[in-house]
Amino acid sequence: MKVRLGGRRGTLILAVGLMAGLILGAGASARAERSHPLVKLETSMGDITLELYPDKAPVTVANFLEYVKAGFFNGTIFHRVISTFMIQGGGLDAQMNKKPTRAPIKNEADNGLTNDAYTVAMARTGDPNSATAQFFISTVNNTFLNHTAKTPQGWGYAVFGKVVKGKEVVDKIKAVPTATKGMHENVPVEPVTIVKATVVQN
């Protein structure tokens, strides 16, 4: 059956239909954005909210959320702070004791995400597939950490989210005075604690 749209009335109907389509499209886009998990880090210097990307880093996000839900990060500190590089935490308590973790996960740094300022990525050793619980938030664009090749030198560091709220808190943390404590360098003089980590949207 053919539908004829003629004259002013037809134009109006067509315009309304197009507008409705745009609104529905925008709503679908907003829902897609809201579907990303959100994690709030309540720190001793303020709250930081992270948006995670399970579509880009499914293994990494699932691993991080497991630690959050288990309360693993509660009471840990940002133990390594370099203002022109990153703030790292999620593995040590205020006495610099390393918490026991689950098994390491595979490196998903080849997911196309880059280590830009305010992104969150997994910390690891020289072994590309050694990340467990520790993570870092970049304070600058750290392009040298990006994936370039599937080699020990080129694997890079897996980005799995970004700061969507509390960038000013990250800026405050990166500016704290640091010192060497035992074998650890760049440790905040006054502990910066992750009081609690919670999933605010799953």
Where are these predicted regions, by residue range?
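Cyclophilin-like peptidyl-prolyl cis-trans isomerases
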Residues: 2-7, 13-202
